[in-house]
Amino acid sequence: MALRRAITKRLIDCYRSDVTQQHSFFRQLSPYNMKIHRQYMTSPNGPNLTDRIVGIRIESVSPPRREETPVMGLSVSETKKLLRLYQMEKVKERLREIPKSSVSYWEFIQICCESCGNDEQGSQMAKSLDHSGCVVVLGDIVFLHPHQIAKSMEAMIKQTSVLPNDPRKEELVQLATTKKSIDIEARRIVQAELYCGLGFLAVQTIGFMRLTFWELSWDVMEPICFFVTTIHFILGYIFFLRTSTEPSFEGLFRQRFKTKQKKLMERHGFDFLRYNELNSLFTTFPCKFHYPV
């Protein structure tokens, strides 16, 4: 019992000594803190900081200005311009859907009025399309494809500039006759080559059938047929690489026809540049001939 009392008394004394030391530490710090507080709150040359804070009128302090970002907008004239452009494109789209090359002026006005919404804007749109060259208005007829009119006028001007008894017409007739004979001969040669190819394939098929059912067996002919088919595919691939043409019967015919046509023209001394020049001069809608490559 005596030992327990001694230990308990010792613990109580230690606790009391710790609390006393803490209070003495804060007592030592408090005068220093008060001194710092007075130093910041008072000013030797004017009113102290407390009076300044109390004298501030909060309602007189204006809030910070907000930065307003400029808003990009369209003016009335720009809006009208965009609306007019939209209406014009809408009218052009309606005109492109018409399969005919020309319509009456009344139908043209109706299309413009339906696209624009009223008669006044439709009339203005029709005049704008006429002035811009999108259509050609001649009397009561409106031509929807001005480029065709331009080509026709160009051909007519060329024809009127040519004399009725121009000797170049005879030259064009001779060149056209020579070209026609060259085309006929080239076509005949190519058709003969294609018939030879058909005969070769028929003989090859008959030979493989005889070897399969009479001479040999399918076990022997199966790899042979596979390799022959592969060789045909390789030949078609080489044809495509050299000519950039699809390896079909039509592509083969066209390519062989161009090759034979070129050789025959060189043999007969045919001037294809002169032929194109005269053809465009004396023909209303010329079809230019391209030299075979």
Curated annotation (Swiss-Prot):
Transit peptide: 1-5
Principal subcellular localisation of the protein: mitochondrion
Bilayer topology annotation: Multi-pass membrane protein
InterPro entries named in the record: MCU_C (IPR006769), MCU_fam (IPR039055)
Subcellular locations according to the entry: Mitochondrion inner membrane
Keyword line: Calcium, Calcium channel, Calcium transport, Ion channel, Ion transport, Membrane, Metal-binding, Mitochondrion, Mitochondrion inner membrane, Transit peptide, Transmembrane, Transmembrane helix, Transport
GO biological process, any: mitochondrial calcium ion homeostasis
Similarity comment: Belongs to the MCU (TC 1.A.77) family.
Record's protein name: Calcium uniporter protein 5, mitochondrial
